[in-house]
């Protein structure tokens, strides 16, 4: 029996009423911000791990758990939420822009008969949207890296930003507007790598699990494929991520930057800290990836349901 739409759920032309694009973009940003509240401590630990032992073989933190305990002891419970305002602004700018660009490009490239873009085209759309969102979100990213790194420094060396807006204002005032986009190339590169790795590894992992004969196309299969995809994505994107973190946190020494460019970061990390130091902070990065994605979609679904109930029904 065919389902019938409720009287208030359709417009004058008989088509189902849907949320305006602006509302979809707003909800996308808010969903990302909601998820960030829960995973911010993991972001902070990841950033501290990536800066640990910079330029030396000796590390400040032995493991991610050691880093978390050390931060709690030295800075208290509030310390693990340092930089939350910057994390929220990053989601507000990055997620909203990425979702907006993706939606617009997806609709433009959908056929007149409603045929959606193919896999390869969707991958290109995703990478383009991710890179654009990363560019827009770079100022908040710079503030986030600096704010989360501050607690590891001696008091006289700390930047002491009060919140993300204070950080952005002082960066412009003390270092100039271009500094807000310091590290934008590796930030955009990371977004491209993450989108490409997630798309490719998820579909391949899902197919591998189905072909094994132990899984059927259900939520367990999707969960396991997501976990494998997250592992691959983390491994692929972490070297780019540590480049981004180091560049955005660097200071000027005798009028010269600590690193010339991204390649210089990679060379120095491998030379002075060891090859596997490119994956510092792997555990919190991987642990953050899954929950943040899941929570984002949960919040997004709940906001969409509430909007439909309040404004599109009855």
Swiss-Prot record:
N-acetylalanine: residues bearing it: 2
Catalytic activity line of the entry: (S)-malate(in) + 2-oxoglutarate(out) = (S)-malate(out) + 2-oxoglutarate(in); malonate(in) + 2-oxoglutarate(out) = malonate(out) + 2-oxoglutarate(in); succinate(in) + 2-oxoglutarate(out) = succinate(out) + 2-oxoglutarate(in); maleate(in) + 2-oxoglutarate(out) = maleate(out) + 2-oxoglutarate(in)
Membrane topology: Multi-pass membrane protein
N6-acetyllysine sites (modified residues): 256
Modified residues (Phosphotyrosine): 102
Alphabetically ordered keywords of this record: Acetylation, Antiport, Lipid transport, Membrane, Mitochondrion, Mitochondrion inner membrane, Phosphoprotein, Repeat, Transmembrane, Transmembrane helix, Transport
Main localisation: mitochondrion
Solcar repeat start-end pairs: 23-108, 117-208, 217-306
The family this protein is said to belong to: Belongs to the mitochondrial carrier (TC 2.A.29) family.
Subunit record text: Interacts with SMIM26.
Name of the protein in its database record: Mitochondrial 2-oxoglutarate/malate carrier protein
């Amino acid at each position: 029996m065919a389902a019938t739409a409720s009287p208030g759920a359709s417009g004058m032309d008989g088509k189902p009423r849907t949320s305006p694009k602006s509302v979809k973009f707003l909800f996308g940003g808010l969903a990302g911000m909601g998820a960030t509240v829960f995973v911010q401590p993991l972001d902070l630990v990841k950033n501290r791990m990536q800066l640990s032992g910079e330029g030396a073989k000796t590390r400040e933190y032995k493991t991610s758990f050691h880093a978390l305990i050390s931060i709690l002891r030295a800075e208290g419970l509030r310390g693990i939420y340092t930089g939350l305002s910057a994390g929220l602004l990053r989601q507000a700018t990055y997620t909203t822009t990425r979702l907006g660009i993706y939606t617009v490009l997806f609709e433009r490239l959908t056929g007149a008969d409603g045929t959606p873009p193919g896999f390869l085209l969707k991958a290109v759309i995703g990478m383009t949207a991710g890179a654009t969102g990363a560019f827009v979100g770079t100022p908040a990213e710079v503030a986030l890296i600096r704010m989360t790194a501050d607690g590891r420094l001696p008091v006289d060396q700390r930047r002491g930003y009060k919140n993300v807006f204070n950080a952005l204002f002082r960066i412009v005032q003390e270092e100039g507007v271009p500094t807000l986009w310091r590290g934008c190339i590796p930030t955009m590169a990371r977004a491209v790598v993450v989108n490409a790795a997630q798309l490719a590894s998820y579909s391949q992992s899902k197919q591998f699990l189905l072909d094994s004969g132990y899984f059927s196309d259900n939520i367990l299969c999707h969960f396991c494929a997501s976990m494998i995809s997250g592992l691959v994505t983390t491994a692929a994107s972490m070297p780019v991520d540590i480049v981004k973190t180091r560049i955005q946190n660097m200071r000027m020494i005798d009028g010269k930057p600590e690193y010339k460019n991204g390649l210089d970061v990679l060379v120095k990390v491998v030379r002075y800290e060891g090859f596997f130091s490119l994956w510092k902070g792997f555990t919190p990065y991987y642990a953050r990836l899954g929950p943040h994605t899941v929570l984002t979609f949960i919040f997004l679904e709940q906001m969409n349901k509430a909007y439909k109930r309040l404004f599109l029904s009855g």
